[in-house]
A protein has these predicted regions:
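Conserved catalytic cores of phosphodiester-cleaving nucleases, focusing on short active-site segments
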Residues: 57-59, 64-72, 91
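Short, low-complexity, polybasic intrinsically disordered segments
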Residues: 106, 110-190
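Intrinsically disordered, low-complexity segments enriched in glycine/proline and serine/threonine
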Residues: 33-35, 72, 170-178, 182, ...
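Basic, amphipathic N-terminal segments that precede the first structured/catalytic domain
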Residues: 1-51, 193-203
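Intrinsic-disorder/low-complexity loop/linker signature
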Residues: 19, 28, 63, 71-73, ...
Length: 203
């Protein structure tokens, strides 16, 4: 097994968006991000805890953090939705411990994007529920749609929550990320995580 310092915690969106079961990737992009699955694996190994879940990627901008979860499979029922929720909670706890910040302190600095495969036609009931919610609020069509019951996490756990199809993610977010991705911030986070591992390995 590799030593922690030999593990690469940065990877490309091409890799973090990969569906290992289907052996396909949702995002053909060379942009570098923090591979939060790898962070989680080292965290689990350090504390010798039961397997936990995590979001796929972490992006860092200035003093703000953005989790990205890629969901290529079907989101059919409460079990699938609960898995997404579990990844959110576990990832926030891991990030909180690494940064030595409470969840309250992080709430206004962390946002979340779920990228899903709209072609699978598994979102209809969630879309209907969201449209009903917006209609109930008597809001116009410009309000941001947030599917899969994730709206409740906005202002509760995250500063902002977004749910995008692959094409929406590319058009609304990817170009901005290409222009503003600061690799040095990813490297700083890697260093911080390595220090976290070293400190807790000695306790």
């Amino acid at each position: 097994m590799k030593k922690d310092k030999d593990i690469e915690y940065k990877s490309r969106l091409l890799e973090t968006s990969k569906d290992k079961a289907k052996k396909e990737t949702m995002m053909d992009s060379e942009i570098e991000v923090i591979n939060f699955d790898t962070i989680k694996d080292s965290y689990v190994q350090l504390f010798k805890i039961e397997k936990i879940n995590s979001n796929d990627a972490l992006i860092i901008r200035d003093d703000e953090y953005l989790f990205i979860e890629f969901k290529n499979g079907k989101i059919r029922d409460i079990k699938d939705v609960f898995e997404i929720y579990s990844k959110i909670y576990d990832s926030l706890i891991i990030l909180s411990n690494i940064l030595e910040k409470t969840l309250i302190e992080l709430k206004d600095r962390v946002s979340y994007i779920l990228v899903f495969n709209k072609e699978l036609e598994h979102t209809r009931k969630f879309e209907r529920a969201e449209e009903g919610f917006i209609k109930h609020l008597n809001k116009n069509s410009e309000i941001e749609r947030i599917y899969f019951g994730l709206r409740k996490f906005e202002k509760y756990c995250f500063k902002k929550v977004y749910t995008y199809s692959v094409e929406e993610f590319k058009s609304k977010f990817l170009q901005s990320l290409k222009e503003n991705n600061d690799i040095s911030l990813l490297e700083e986070f890697e260093d911080k995580f390595l220090k976290f591992l070293e400190k807790n390995n000695n306790d």
